[in-house]
Amino acid sequence: MAQGAARCPPRVARKAAGPGGRATFPSVSESDSLQARVDRLELPFNEFGVDPYGISKRHLKQALPVFAALYRYYFRVRCFGIEHIPPRGRAMLVGNHSGGVAVDGAMVLASTMLEMEPPRLAQGMVERFLHKFPVSSLWASRTGQFTGLPEHARRLLEDDRLLMIFPEGAKGTAKLYRQRYSLVDFGTGFIRLALQTRSPIIPFAFLGGGTAIPTVFNAYGLGKLLGVPYVPLTPYVLPLPLPVQLEIHYGEPLVFQGTGDEEDHVIEGYVQKVKARISGLIERGRAERHGRRQGTRLLP
């Protein structure tokens, strides 16, 4: 990312986290502002506040204050380059997984809702196991997060939605603490999807999730008993996120030409270009983070 890229401007002044780093929930005036941001989403809600995909204004208005508290006060997220996300029209946010719990996706969603003008809803593709749990499945779909099926993703883009994709898949969430800034193999489906729908790809780097949830071991056997792929275990056993400052670095859009029917080696070449861009954003973000902590300014 170019030096000096604009930081996402906070729409509401941040407050210090509560005692012990706990999230402080928004005040009444802030809650009113959050409700207004949901109302300003440019989605085709009907008279009951539900869009054609089942996204519910009521559920978004209940969820956004929780996301805002985590984003602004608990994780104190720093966001850079959000001007690279188009305010309207189809686009794909493609980035790295960071941490064994879906903190990354939640905070990316929060950034587009809280920092963009007008606000946009980033819609993600969730793992199928989530639908084994009725409550989480309901809330996921009512807030725009759907099962990661190609037909769902294509329909969303054809309807000019903002799609959030983590091409590392479930393997990306299984990274241990020592692997937190590495990238595992990317799937290729997202490139074919981008070509078929002529969607720009906005790469992003998510930093800090692996420190917030410092996974030292993944308990696959326990996960099987609980109906999930695995349970990440930390030095304090439970995978509860620590109040570590997180960062999101959005890069300039990537546009590839093609139909999506290209040979595998062509698609793989495009995948590697996206992966290299995300890796570059991670390394640049880490260097800038280190520079701020050291009180030094990075050279160009």
Q: Which sequence ranges carry the predicted segments?
A:
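Non-catalytic C-terminal accessory region of glycerolipid acyltransferases
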Residues: A2-H59, R154-P300
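Membrane-anchoring hydrophobic helices of lipid-metabolizing enzymes
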Residues: R7, R11-E151, A219, E283-P300
